[in-house]
């Protein structure tokens, strides 16, 4: 099974997960410490963003058609689920806070500084966006 999943595209993986039995979805989502309904919407949203990037879609100021289910703690902070930042929140909850993720977040900051005319707010980034992305789990109840 693991070898088969390694061959899937992200879109195929999303569809495969959606068609699994709920108990299997729960077991997989549990390894990421999230609810399976959240996990399912997240991988579908991530696949959608991936497809936008792969097919020359626009992420800047884009309103996403496939939106991830957000934890209340994030929506209470004013983080929407229909912009890029909402999807980045989901990705940050699926990857460990390792060097690659930190490097990616720093790259976003460097790019935003280099192109100061491009406003991160148009993609749903709040003022404290970097702090949140680097430590998303602290916003979730233990």
Give short role names for the model-derived ranges.
Residues 1-142:
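Long, contiguous internal "core" modules enriched in hydrophobic/ aromatic residues
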């Amino acid at each position: 099974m693991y070898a088969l999943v390694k061959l899937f595209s992200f879109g195929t993986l999303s569809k495969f997960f959606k068609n699994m039995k709920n108990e299997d979805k729960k077991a997989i989502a549990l390894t990421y410490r999230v609810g399976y309904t959240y996990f399912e919407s997240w991988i579908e949203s991530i696949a959608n963003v991936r497809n936008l990037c792969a097919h020359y879609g626009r992420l800047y100021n884009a309103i996403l058609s496939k939106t991830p289910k957000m934890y209340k703690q994030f929506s209470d902070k004013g983080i929407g689920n229909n912009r890029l930042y909402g999807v980045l929140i989901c990705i940050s909850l699926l990857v460990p806070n390792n060097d690659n993720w930190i490097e990616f977040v720093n790259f976003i900051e460097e790019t935003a500084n280099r192109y100061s005319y491009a406003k991160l707010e148009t993609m749903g980034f709040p003022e404290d966006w970097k702090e949140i992305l680097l430590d998303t789990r602290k916003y979730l109840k233990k």
